Each structure stands twice: as C-alpha cells, then as structure tokens.
Amino acid sequence: MMPSRTNLATGIPSSKVKYSRLSSTDDGYIDLQFKKTPPKIPYKAIALATVLFLIGAFLIIIGSLLLSGYISKGGADRAVPVLIIGILVFLPGFYHLRIAYYASKGYRGYSYDDIPDFDD
C-alpha cells in the first residue's frame, strides 16, 4: 500500500490523491515547448516606414530638381534644405522597410522584432 501524503499546513493526511508512474521513455520534454510561434507582424510600423520612404523619396527628387534648375522656384537656397529633409525622412523609412523585407523572406539575422512597434 502507498503511503498517504500529509498536508503540511493542516497536518491532515490526504488519501484522495492518486499517483501514477511516469513512463520510463519520457525524457521530460513536450513537443509544444519546441514549436515556434508565428511572428507578430507590425503592420502599423511597416505602413509608417512606407510613408516615410515615399515622402523622403519625393523630397529628394524635388530637391534634386530644384538644385539642377529644372524647377526654377528659388534656386539652391531652397534646394539644399529640401534635400536634407528628404534624406532625413528617407533613411529611417528605407532602413525599416529593408528589415521588414528581409524578415518576410526569412533571411538569417532579421526578424520583425527588430522593427519598433506601437504596443497596441
């Protein structure tokens, strides 16, 4: 007969608990702990990166046209700030779109976790 366990808090023996032996082939692991959950795709952050990329590209094109003289509304004194703002807006958009693209293709070292999310 198996000995009954004692509840330490009250000192009352508990005989209603049923015990069963584990299988000798069980190594203590379950399959679920090795399954990888699908990545959460940050759609809002990717949309924002796309908007930054497009606005930055547009400003770079406009700044280049202003600087070269195809658009004659002020010359170089207006072209340089437009180019600088275009580059500053373009770079983060390009960077995060590149990470999103490589993560979607499954390249090693890239994941959606590298893109900042809005915690919704």
Swiss-Prot record:
Keyword Phosphoprotein set for record: yes
Keywords: Cytoplasmic vesicle, Disease variant, Endosome, Golgi apparatus, Membrane, Neurodegeneration, Parkinson disease, Parkinsonism, Phosphoprotein, Synapse, Transmembrane, Transmembrane helix
InterPro entries: TMEM230 (IPR044234), TMEM_230/134 (IPR008590)
The keyword Transmembrane belongs to this UniProt entry's keyword annotation: yes
Implicated disorder: Parkinson disease: A complex neurodegenerative disorder characterized by bradykinesia, resting tremor, muscular rigidity and postural instability. Additional features are characteristic postural abnormalities, dysautonomia, dystonic cramps, and dementia. The pathology of Parkinson disease involves the loss of dopaminergic neurons in the substantia nigra and the presence of Lewy bodies (intraneuronal accumulations of aggregated proteins), in surviving neurons in various areas of the brain.
Similarity comment: Belongs to the TMEM134/TMEM230 family.
Protein's recorded name: Transmembrane protein 230
Organism (species): Homo sapiens (Human)
Name of the coding gene: TMEM230
